[in-house]
């Protein structure tokens, strides 16, 4: 699953410009976003495309208790079949901007965080689906996950779907039928992402500052983790 990600203000602005969104959402850089966080989400076709604040954790329209029914992720392999996701896939697709995301390696009973971000090029346009919050609150969304790319596979078997620019345009086009878009939900090619072992501060969701991205140092941080995974 994808359980934490980073969004820097400058990356948000860059991706919104790429997607043709004129109104830049009010947002301060955050370095440890987790389910239930309120974050920018892009939806709709050009030229009426907008960025809105939405809550991570999709609440199905039939949920009796929204707080207990949040779905942070939807698997690409089953998103078209599951009742909780099927209608959103057809009618309510979105892109969630991200600078990068975290995954954890389990080693000796310890959780060691790794940060994955593009080596170069634009920020990540993560594929999502959303539901209207109605009178109860903001829209809610789930990130779609797929099998891991090579840089990630040694740590975790899943990753969020990151869409290239043309794929992001197709994903946001309501005239595109969902079955035609399913082939877009695939891993990134090898070499796109850089992997860095980072501070265990990110293990605690209350830590949201830029120090979450500091490289792991000292014996307690196991600074040789990058060599051990062959991801240098």
Regions found by a protein language model. Give the residues of each.
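Short linear sequence motif anchored by a di-proline
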Residues: 1-232
């Amino acid at each position: 699953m994808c359980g934490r990600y980073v969004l820097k203000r400058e990356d948000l602005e860059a991706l919104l410009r790429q997607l043709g969104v004129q109104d830049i959402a009010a947002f301060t850089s955050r370095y440890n976003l987790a389910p239930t966080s309120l974050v920018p989400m892009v939806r709709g076709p050009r030229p009426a495309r907008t960025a809105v604040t939405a809550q991570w954790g999709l609440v199905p329209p039939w949920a009796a208790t929204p707080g207990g029914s949040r779905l942070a992720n939807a698997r690409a392999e089953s998103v078209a079949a599951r009742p909780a996701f099927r209608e959103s896939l057809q009618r309510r697709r979105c892109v969630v901007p991200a600078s990068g995301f975290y995954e954890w390696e389990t080693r000796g009973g310890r959780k060691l965080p790794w940060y994955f971000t593009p080596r170069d090029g634009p920020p990540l346009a993560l594929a999502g689906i959303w539901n209207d919050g109605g009178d109860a609150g903001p829209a809610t969304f789930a990130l779609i996950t797929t099998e891991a790319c090579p840089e990630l596979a040694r740590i975790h078997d899943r990753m969020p779907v990151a869409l290239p620019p043309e794929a992001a345009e197709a994903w946001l086009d309501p005239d595109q039928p969902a079955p035609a878009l399913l082939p877009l939900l695939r891993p990134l090619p090898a070499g796109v992402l850089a992997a860095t072992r980072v501070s265990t501060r990110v293990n605690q969701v209350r830590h949201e500052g830029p120090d979450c991205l500091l490289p792991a140092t000292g014996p307690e941080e196991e600074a040789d983790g990058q060599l051990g995974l062959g991801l240098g």
